[in-house]
Amino acid sequence: MICCLASAACPLRDTAAPLAACDGEATIRAVYDAGIDLGHYGEVDQLAPAGAMAEFTAYVRRQSAEEAEAAFAPLRQAARSRGMDMRLHVVYGPGAVRDLLRRWREEGDVRVFGGEGMPLA
């Protein structure tokens, strides 16, 4: 499996290397660390009405998804031009990135690209 990592502070700089490493794989998994999950505040604010809480949480999730799409747009476009798919996963914090990578590694070999400067150790 090919996996690419990025965050706002650590963008994916090289799209050629993961594409070249695919060896016939049809899907690249892209993981975007959106940092702190501000949606949590929409879930725990006891003074806010339920509708406002849900709207805020949805807004935060939408913002994170838009950031992730923008961060991986060049990779998605390059993958599409080669007939490949890219699955985007938005997670919150380095712990979530580590957990996702650990789970995928239990399923098989994972080659990771990007993530330079991300605190994953």
Go through the PLM ranges and name each one.
Residues 111-121:
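Glycine-rich, Arg-bearing micro-motifs that act as flexible, cationic patches
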Residues 1-56:
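Small/aliphatic-rich secondary-structure junction motif
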Residues 12-15, 68-73:
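Well-ordered, non-membrane alpha-helical segments in soluble/globular domains
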Residues 30-32, 90-92, 116:
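A general secondary-structure junction signal
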Residues 16-18, 75, 100:
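Aromatic/hydrophobic pocket-lining residues that form π-stacking "cages" and hydrophobic walls in ligand
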Residues 7-12, 92-96, 118-119:
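Short beta->alpha connector loops
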Residues 51-70:
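A short acidic, glycine-rich active-site loop
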Residues 77-111:
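Structural beta-alpha unit
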